[in-house]
From Swiss-Prot:
Disulphide linkage map: none
GO biological process terms on file: base-excision repair, AP site formation via deaminated base removal
Function: Excises uracil residues from the DNA which can arise as a result of misincorporation of dUMP residues by DNA polymerase or due to deamination of cytosine.
Cellular compartments annotated: Cytoplasm
Keyword Cytoplasm on entry: yes
Keyword annotations from UniProtKB, A to Z: Cytoplasm, DNA damage, DNA repair, Hydrolase
Molecular function (Gene Ontology), one example: uracil DNA N-glycosylase activity
Gene symbol of the encoding locus: ung
UniProt-annotated catalytic positions: D65 (proton acceptor)
Signal sequence bounds: none
Annotated protein name in UniProt: Uracil-DNA glycosylase
Main location, first listed in the record: cytoplasm
Length: 225
């Protein structure tokens, strides 16, 4: 059974859902959702692909696996639901946005407005057990999300790929098309942000590139709720 995105990802990814690795992943997930507390909700797993059609992708921000606390994850890398405290890595992203582009620091971490502007907020693993980071690593999601990156790499319109931290930077090998722009640094996590994330200006660099190819720049300001 294929997931439905209701956009051009449906045709592009339909073959993945028939592959053995995905059928095994699906069996694993059915059991996990029955027996464990899993994030995000099964209805939110593919939100990044549902909100940002292939043809509209301007920017990819690659994350690792979803937040594993209650009510945080909702299918977008780095984003949390409204009313949930902004996690530390996202707080640091907002600090960098403030120094880079002067955006005020919002009272929430709900990044849906980025997704609607063509930012694919993609985690490399799309599900996780509550309280257990990386618990769904190596179960098949990486094959699926690598395929997403490969399809984006083939696109004839340039895309900005933002890769923060070792896990994301390891995907650089999939981005071989020279028309794309890669922006990379250490992760915005408090463990590494002072070692090269702060001051790296990824947001203005992204907009400068988009303007250079006659694309509308991103409005990075997340509004207060």
């Amino acid at each position: 059974m294929a997931a439905e995105f209701n956009n051009d990802w449906d045709d592009l990814l339909k073959d993945e859902f028939e592959k053995e690795y995905y059928l095994n992943l699906r069996k694993f997930l059915i059991d996990e959702y029955k027996t464990q507390k899993i994030h995000p909700s099964m209805y939110d797993i593919f939100n990044a692909l549902k909100f940002t059609p292939y043809k509209d992708v301007k920017v990819v921000i690659l994350g690792q696996d979803p937040y594993h606390g209650p009510n945080q994850a909702h299918g977008f890398s780095f984003s949390v639901k409204p009313g949930v405290q902004t996690p530390p890595s996202l707080r640091n992203m907002f600090k960098e946005l403030n120094s880079d582009l002067g955006c005020y620091i919002p009272n929430n971490g709900f990044l849906e407005s980025w997704a609607k502007q063509g930012i694919l907020l993609l985690n490399t693993v799309l599900t996780v057990r509550e309280g257990q980071a990386n618990s769904h690593k190596g179960k098949g999601w990486e094959i699926f999300t690598d395929r997403v990156i490969e399809l984006l790499n083939k696109r004839e319109e340039p895309i900005v790929f933002i890769l923060w931290g070792r896990n994301a930077i390891s995907k650089e090998t999939l981005i071989t098309n020279p028309i794309h722009k890669i922006i990379k640094s250490v992760h915005p996590s408090p463990l590494s942000a002072t070692r090269g994330f702060f001051g790296s200006k990824p947001f203005s660099k992204t907009n400068d590139f988009l303007v250079s190819i006659n694309k509308e720049p991103i409005d990075w300001q997340i509004p207060n709720i």
